[in-house]
Amino acid sequence: MKQLLEFIPLILFFAVYKLVGIREAAITLIIATLIQLLILKIKYGKVEKQQLFMGIAVVFFGTLTAYFNQLEYLKWKVTIVYAIFALVLLVSQYGFNKNLIKLMLGKEDALELPEQVWNRLNLGWALFFLLCMLINLYISQYLSDDLWVDFKTFGILGMTLIATIITGIYIYRYLPQTKSNNKE
């Protein structure tokens, strides 16, 4: 349910943008995001830092988008957020010797992987966020607003799904293999 809850504001934004327009879509996105954060707080007792950061970014850039009736502000939000995600992953690993992917996945799922695997995963996700940033920058500047909204809603979602599947396949190779002994 938690993952589904994260997509509801985006889906509502897409629908309202296609049916009504940018100002109403931005306002819908802001309200849906605030409700989402409230539900997360009530249901899970806390809001993760990443979700809070995204919520603040949505409110800030969404407000600018609604006020000026210009989609450019939300386009920049996506570019800036992905740049920050990539930067945080890289600086935490190479500047502070902390692997955030390991902290997120290793604790929650009790994954025990070799350190080099965690480092590659961290670097891989940083590169993924940089790729998303660059593709978003290109589409937002050179293609139509309608195409950008489609890309933001479905393209990045698809790219993230593919990156997650690749991560799972990569991790699976390093999981301890259990041997089943069915001899009686």
Swiss-Prot record:
GO cellular component: plasma membrane
Keywords from the UniProt entry: Cell inner membrane, Cell membrane, Membrane, Transmembrane, Transmembrane helix
Coiled-coil boundaries: none
Pfam families attached to this UniProt entry: IspA (PF04279)
Cell compartments where the protein resides: Cell inner membrane
Annotated TM spans: 19-39, 52-72, 76-96, 123-143, 151-171
Primary role: Plays a role in cell envelope biogenesis, maintenance of cell envelope integrity and membrane homeostasis.
Family that this chain belongs to: Belongs to the YciB family.
Protein's name according to its UniProt entry: Inner membrane-spanning protein YciB
Organism field: Pasteurella multocida (strain Pm70)
Protein's gene: yciB
